[in-house]
């Protein structure tokens, strides 16, 4: 027998159907309740009590704590729908109407504590038409709108990994057809999958949505002609944001084609291996190149640094412009110090502009914008008389309309602004003629109350009589219970307390009506003025965003100059040659982790006409991996326009960096350690060019010695002799046989990590010198790792037998085993 649903639960089911796969928070009075499976999820993830009523599981959170709890849910990858109840101001009986007015997902955040300050927060839509893939992504918090198109899944996955969205959107058929793509993305990214109706991804629906959003009749002006899959993804994404999530899209910038400007390409594996954004072991930045380079003072500058780190420049002009600016500020220590202080006062102009454009801004946000814009004018004043490098020329010439806005915000607003419009006290008295008049009436009400209280005390003879105010009662007169009979008959009883009585009078009631009327008028006026001010600011949004870009650029180069000053970095010569020459180079991360002066610098000299490949041998723990990573990191920093930790450097522009470092099973894809190694190496062989930099560490370890050696040598020969694939390569290996290639190929040079011996014990020098290593010292490393001494001793015996005339050691007699 099924229970008949109550009207309220019928209402909940209707909302739940609309919410789809979102967790539904259903407003009931002063709480948001969850039912059935949602209640269980809520209780488990928020550590709140799970109860039940009539066998229906339920849990709830106070309405006053909603935002904090929602942030916790979204941070764990949940999508949340909020069903609000309509105002019941008229006190009508019956069921209060409830509708979903908000859906919150990880990728579609306009304003939230979850938004990373110095990184983008993208929601990305993906679509397939034939063999072509189109993608579109949005950062709603700043209005960035990107589209792209790819003809293979490899480039598609690499692009998505670089963008690192927190939410992926497509339709059911795409997810079913591209399970392998989704699995690869989930392996690299922490991403929430969202599904949307397939018709939104059709060309007619998508173009209609784009036309409506940008008020155009053609997309050719955006450069999107012919990009059908990308257009389909873009239109569907707009529909999802506006029609499904009920969020505004009017603030979005016009769609730009992602990847049009050529960059130094660093695939996801290399980003991970080189620890650009985070160390391999741990999700936080500590120990990453980003953590070392992060000296920015603004959110915009921080986002620019992060994006440039994984997308360094390929255009020599872009690199040189930034190098010139870094050099300028490196020589201007006093100016740099002043600018750092002023930049630290500039808040997130992009996200503030978005909040104002989408009617989410509070008065305090307007105050933050005002203070940030004022700081920008101070920055402009300090740069005014400087002979700025070309990169910054004219960027801080603040347009007259923006100057007028800044003046308005500076002179017409009260200094300390409230969090809510309803609190009032936003505008200066002179901003509107009615403001001062209404405020005077409100202010005079306080003195009227005091005068009225004193008058009726004298009239009644009750000296302890008080005139008070309470939210529920309004203004009232309070006297002790035993004195209440002394009051005149015109005093009207309002409330009885334990030891007091509360009254009102016709005069007090009339005063209250007038005061409340004034407060209502004042709140209505300030609300109207606040909306008008926001519209005025929105009219200047493009100018604010242009200034925001200038601030980001300035912050970027000033922070790099600060970094160079702190660690005595030098300017590398970057050009179109094929040189890779570094004198006294150092690993930028290791340099910060060691005591000053203890890191051993090393030289590197490579040139396509001479040394194209370095074969690096030496024992583990001697610094081989640090050295080869170091070269890649210095190239990346140089092509960011940064100075680098080296005495000098000459770097010909690199188009791609590939790394094959370390080993690890990929269980989710059913791939062994060796298979992962081979797949990543295959990617390098297919995609490297003559201008690429390839870092290979221990290729061929996961199979038999001869198999591994054969593969390693074949890879070396391919990169040495195949036209179009002659990349500069640093190859760290334990295969001594490979070092013989130096005798047969002029483009190969042997280097090794130097080790000295003292009484048979190795001393690692961490110097990279010419020639190949004679010993690997693996047993010594095993001893340092804590091997039992008996195992270490036996390994030494076996090693001596290997090195002797009999190359096959006999098992110890006491330990001999019958082998099959």
From Swiss-Prot:
Keywords: ATP-binding, DNA damage, DNA repair, DNA-binding, Nucleotide-binding
Statement: the UniProt record of this protein carries the keyword Transcription regulation: no
MF terms in GO: ATP binding; ATP-dependent DNA damage sensor activity; damaged DNA binding; mismatched DNA binding
One GO BP: mismatch repair
Transmembrane is among the record's keywords: no
GO CC annotation: cytosol
Matches recorded under PROSITE patterns: DNA_MISMATCH_REPAIR_2
Gene3D superfamilies: 1.10.1420.10, DNA repair protein MutS, domain I (3.40.1170.10), MutS, connector domain (3.30.420.110), P-loop containing nucleotide triphosphate hydrolases (3.40.50.300)
Superkingdom of this protein's organism: Bacteria
Annotated residues for binding of ATP: 618-625
Family of the protein in this entry: Belongs to the DNA mismatch repair MutS family.
Record function comment: This protein is involved in the repair of mismatches in DNA. It is possible that it carries out the mismatch recognition step. This protein has a weak ATPase activity.
HAMAP family with a match to the protein in the record: MutS (MF_00096)
Protein name in UniProt: DNA mismatch repair protein MutS
């Amino acid at each position: 027998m099924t229970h008949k649903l109550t009207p309220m639960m019928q209402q909940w089911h209707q909302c739940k159907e609309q919410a789809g796969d979102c967790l539904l928070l259903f407003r009931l009075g002063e709480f948001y309740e969850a039912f059935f499976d949602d209640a269980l999820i809520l209780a488990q993830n928020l550590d709140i009590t799970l109860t039940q009523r009539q066998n229906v599981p339920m849990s709830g959170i106070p309405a006053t704590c909603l935002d904090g709890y929602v942030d916790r849910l979204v941070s764990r990858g949940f999508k949340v729908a909020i069903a609000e109840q309509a105002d019941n101001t008229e006190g009508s009986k019956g069921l209060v109407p409830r509708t979903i007015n908000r859906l919150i997902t990880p990728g579609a955040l306009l304003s939230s504590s979850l938004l990373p300050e110095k990184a983008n927060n993208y929601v990305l839509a993906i679509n397939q038409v034939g063999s072509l893939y189109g993608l579109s992504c949005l950062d709603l918090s700043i209005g960035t709108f990107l589209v792209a198109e790819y003809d293979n899944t490899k480039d598609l996955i690499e692009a998505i990994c670089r963008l690192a969205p927190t939410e992926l959107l497509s339709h059911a058929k795409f997810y079913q057809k591209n399970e392998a793509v989704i699995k690869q993305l989930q392996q690299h990214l922490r991403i929430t999958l969202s599904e949307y109706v397939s018709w939104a991804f059709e060309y007619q629906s998508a173009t209609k949505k784009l036309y409506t959003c940008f008020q155009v009749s053609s997309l050719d002006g955006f450069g999107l002609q012919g990009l059908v899959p990308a257009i389909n993804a873009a239109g569907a994404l707009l529909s999802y944001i506006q029609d499904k999530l009920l969020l505004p899209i009017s603030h979005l910038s016009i769609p730009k084609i992602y990847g049009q400007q050529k960059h130094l390409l660093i695939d996801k594996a290399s980003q991970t291996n080189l620890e650009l954004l985070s160390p391999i072991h741990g999700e936080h930045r500590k120990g990453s190149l980003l953590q070392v380079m992060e000296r920015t003072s603004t959110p915009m500058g921080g986002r620019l640094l992060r994006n440039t780190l994984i997308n360094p420049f390929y255009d020599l002009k872009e690199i040189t412009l930034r190098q010139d600016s870094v050099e300028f500020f490196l020589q201007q220590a006093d100016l740099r110090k002043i600018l750092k202080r002023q930049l630290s006062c500039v808040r997130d102009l992009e996200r503030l502009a978005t909040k104002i454009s989408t009617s989410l801004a509070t008065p305090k946000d307007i105050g933050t914008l005002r203070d940030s814009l004022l700081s920008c004018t101070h920055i402009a004043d300090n740069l005014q008389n400087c002979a700025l490098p070309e990169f910054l020329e004219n960027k801080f010439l603040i347009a007259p309309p923006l100057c007028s806005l800044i003046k308005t915000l500076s002179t017409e607003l009260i200094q300390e602004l409230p969090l809510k419009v309803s609190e009032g006290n936003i505008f200066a008295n002179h901003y509107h003629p009615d403001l001062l008049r209404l405020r005077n009436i409100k202010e005079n009400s306080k003195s009227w109350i005091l005068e009225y209280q004193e008058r009726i005390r004298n009239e009644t003879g009750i000296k302890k009589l008080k005139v008070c105010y309470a939210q529920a009662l309004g203004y009232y007169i309070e006297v002790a219970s035993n004195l209440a009979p002394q009051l005149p008959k015109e005093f009207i009883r309002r409330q009885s307390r334990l030891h007091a009585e509360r009254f009102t009078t016709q005069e007090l009631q009339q005063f209250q009506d007038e005061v409340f009327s004034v407060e209502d008028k004042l709140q209505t006026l300030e609300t109207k003025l606040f909306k008008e001010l926001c519209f005025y600011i929105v009219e200047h949004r493009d100018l604010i965003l242009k200034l925001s870009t200038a601030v980001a650029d300035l912050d970027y180069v000033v922070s790099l100059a600060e970094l160079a000053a702190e660690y005595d970095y030098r300017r590398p010569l970057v050009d179109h040659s094929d040189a890779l020459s570094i004198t006294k180079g150092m690993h930028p991360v290791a340099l910060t982790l060691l005591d000053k002066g203890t890191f051993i610098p090393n030289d590197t000299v490579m040139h396509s006409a001479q040394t194209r490949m370095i074969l690096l041998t030496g024992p583990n723990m001697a610094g081989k991996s640090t050295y080869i990573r170091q070269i890649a990191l210095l190239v990346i920093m140089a092509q960011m326009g940064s100075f680098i930790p080296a005495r000098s450097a000459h770097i010909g522009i690199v188009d791609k960096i590939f790394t094959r470092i370390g080993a690890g099973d990929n269980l989710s894809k059913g791939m062994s350690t060796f298979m992962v190694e081979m797949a990543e190496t295959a990617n390098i062989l297919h995609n490297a060019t003559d201008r690429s930099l390839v870092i290979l560490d221990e290729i061929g370890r996961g199979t038999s010695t001869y198999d591994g050696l054969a593969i390693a040598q074949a890879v070396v020969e391919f990169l040495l002799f195949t036209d179009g694939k002659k990349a500069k390569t640093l190859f760290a290996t334990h295969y001594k046989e490979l070092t013989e290639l130096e005798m047969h190929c002029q483009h190969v040079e042997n280097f090794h990590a130097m080790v000295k011996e003292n009484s048979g014990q190795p001393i690692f020098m961490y110097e990279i010198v010419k020639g190949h290593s004679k010993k690997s010292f693996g047993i010594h490393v095993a001893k340092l790792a804590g091997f039992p001494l008996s195992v270490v001793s036996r390994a030494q015996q076996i090693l001596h037998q290997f090195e002797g005339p009999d190359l096959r050691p006999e098992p110890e007699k006491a330990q001999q085993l019958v082998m099959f």
